[in-house]
């Protein structure tokens, strides 16, 4: 691996080893890095970092693409069922790869239940929809999930219950789900950055879940004086998640807390935490709310190409369904 990186200008065996230790295992990782990130590595100057990045971008053929090429790339997108046909319809077929989907809502609105159900559905071939002309079939073989839990709400027994409700082995789902408990924002960001190591180790990570995205940031950065620092850090985290989605054709799901809108006289009285940083970085944004009994309402209110719409789904003992 170090021999490959030495093809870059100014990168000898020693520098290559430092890059690998820092997680820069291939040209694409270097090509999508910033000069500041590379200069954090001992012995790499700004000038050397700029040369490395430009050379890596040339080797990865990064640059302008025609609309036809982008349309062809879109054919590699695959989708995962949420468990609810109505919610899948709102999403034009299901949760989409190469994107970040946010589910925000009050406690008990169903955010974590959707995350658990997604881990289960990933192991069911009939819940995965792909255009086999655009997706290499082997790419979706033996898919695995990563679940970064920041609130201590991941319940393996609930995953087993949902799996058995669909007639599959719950142990299989758990075997293919990596779980990490993050107690602060630094741990949360580190776990997200380590996902590439899992992929390089031969794990076919196709689903990444952060539950919840903003709770650690919200707890650590209190008051207006720390808002700018919080948003900058959150922005870097979202950039990591978007990069994972793009480079590895995986689905990224995040849950989000809400806060009251004191100036809201009409309409929605809550708003998702994270402000414009999360708003611009998330591809699809849902707001969840409780309805009667086991029913929940999911409102899609932000998407690059889908209209605003709502879906009603149920949270049952067997999982998410219509």
UniProtKB/Swiss-Prot annotation:
Regions crossing the membrane: none
GO MF entries: ATP binding; ATP hydrolysis activity; ATP-dependent DNA damage sensor activity; damaged DNA binding
Gene3D superfamilies in UniProt: 5' to 3' exonuclease, C-terminal subdomain, P-loop containing nucleotide triphosphate hydrolases
UniProt cross-references to SUPFAM superfamilies, sorted A to Z: P-loop containing nucleoside triphosphate hydrolases (SSF52540), Rad51 N-terminal domain-like (SSF47794)
Organismal lineage: Archaea, Methanobacteriati, Methanobacteriota, Methanomada group, Methanococci
Family, per entry: Belongs to the eukaryotic RecA-like protein family.
Biological source species: Methanococcus maripaludis (strain C7 / ATCC BAA-1331)
Binding site for ATP: 105-112
NCBIfam families the record matches: PRK04301.1, recomb_radA
Annotated keywords: ATP-binding, DNA damage, DNA recombination, DNA-binding, Nucleotide-binding
Protein name from the UniProt record: DNA repair and recombination protein RadA
Gene: radA
Role this protein plays: Involved in DNA repair and in homologous recombination. Binds and assemble on single-stranded DNA to form a nucleoprotein filament. Hydrolyzes ATP in a ssDNA-dependent manner and promotes DNA strand exchange between homologous DNA molecules.
């Amino acid at each position: 691996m170090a021999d490959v990186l030495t093809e870059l200008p100014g990168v000898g065996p020693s520098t290559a080893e430092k890059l690998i230790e820092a997680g820069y295992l291939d040209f694409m990782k270097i090509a999508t890095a910033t000069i500041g990130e590379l200069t954090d590595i001992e012995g790499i100057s700004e000038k050397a970092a700029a040369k490395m990045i430009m050379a890596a971008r040339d080797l990865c053929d990064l640059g302008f693409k025609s609309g036809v090429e982008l349309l062809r790339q879109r054919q590699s997108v695959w989708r995962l069922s949420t468990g609810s046909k109505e919610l899948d319809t709102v999403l034009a077929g299901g949760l989409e790869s190469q994107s970040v989907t946010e589910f925000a809502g009050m406690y008990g609105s169903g955010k974590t239940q959707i995350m658990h159900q997604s881990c289960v559905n990933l192991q069911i071939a009939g819940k995965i929809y792909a255009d086999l002309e655009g997706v290499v079939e082997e790419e979706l073989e033996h898919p695995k999930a990563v679940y970064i839990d920041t609130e201590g709400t991941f319940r393996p027994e609930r995953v087993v219950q949902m799996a058995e409700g669909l007639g599959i082995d719950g142990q299989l789902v758990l075997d293919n789900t990596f779980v990490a408990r993050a107690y602060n924002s630094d741990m949360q960001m580190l776990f997200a950055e380590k996902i590439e190591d899992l992929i390089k180790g031969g794990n076919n990570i196709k689903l990444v879940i952060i539950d919840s995205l903003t709770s650690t940031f919200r707890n650590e950065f209190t008051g207006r004086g720390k808002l700018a620092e919080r948003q900058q850090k959150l922005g870097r985290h979202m950039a990591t998640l978007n990069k994972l989605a793009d480079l590895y054709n995986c689905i990224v799901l995040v849950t989000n807390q809400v806060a009251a809108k004191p100036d809201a006289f009409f309409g929605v009285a809550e708003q998702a935490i994270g402000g414009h940083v999360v708003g611009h970085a998330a591809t699809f944004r849902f707001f969840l709310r409780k309805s009667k009994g086991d029913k929940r309402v999911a409102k899609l209110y932000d998407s690059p190409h889908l209209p605003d719409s709502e879906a009603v789904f149920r949270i049952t003992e067997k999982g998410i369904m219509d």
